Amino acid sequence: MYSRDFHKSIENDEYPQAVRLAEYITSNIPCSTFLDFGCSTGLYLNEIKKRNNIIESVGYEFADDAVSAALCEDVIQFDLTQPLERKKKENTLGLCLEVLEHIDDANWLPVLTNISNLCDTIIFSAALPGQGGTGHINCRPKIDWIRRFHSLGWVIDLDQTKHMLEFMKSGYHMGWFTNNAMVLVKS
C-alpha cells in the first residue's frame, strides 16, 4: 500500500510546508531534541536538521520503502505500536503528522504513550472523518485525540497553536495541516 512512489509523493506535495514548519519551529519552539513519529522519508526531520544541526533529531517510521529512501541518516525503522525503549531527554519536541489514521484504533494508546513519554511539547495532527487519503482506517474527530491526550496528562497550548496556524496560513501549507494540527503541552 505504501510504496516508494507513495512516500515520494508526500515529499513532493509537502516539501514547501516542511520548509515553513521547520522555520516556525526553529524560531518559536526551542528544543534540544526533535523526534518525528511516523516520519516517512524524514522530510520534516531533514528540514529541521538543515536549520539546527546541533540538536539531536530522530525519526521513527514503520514502512521499509520509506526508510530505504530516507533523506537523512536519522530515520529508524520502528513499529510505534510497540514500546519505544529510549531515555527521555529534557526539552524534547515531538512531531506526529497524519500518522494515527493509518493505525488501527486498538493501538492508539501505545502510540500516544510512546510520544507522551518522550516529549515535553508535541505538534500533532490526524485525519478527520471524510478527509480522504491512502490507507486511512482510523479517521476521528479532533476532539477524540484531544481527549485521548488529556487522559495522558496533556492539554492544547491554545496560544502556541493559534500562532503556529497563523504563521502556516500566511504561506504555503496543506489544508489538512491548518484543519488538524495542534500544539500540546503537559498539563
Segments predicted by a language model, with ranges:
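Conserved N-terminal segment of class I S-adenosyl-L-methionine
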Residues: 1-90, 95, 106-118, 129-132, ...
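Hydrophobic adenine-recognition pocket in adenosine-nucleotide-binding enzymes
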Residues: 99
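A short His-aromatic
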Residues: 102-103
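Short glycine-centered segments of the SAM/dcSAM-binding site in methyltransferase folds
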Residues: 121-123
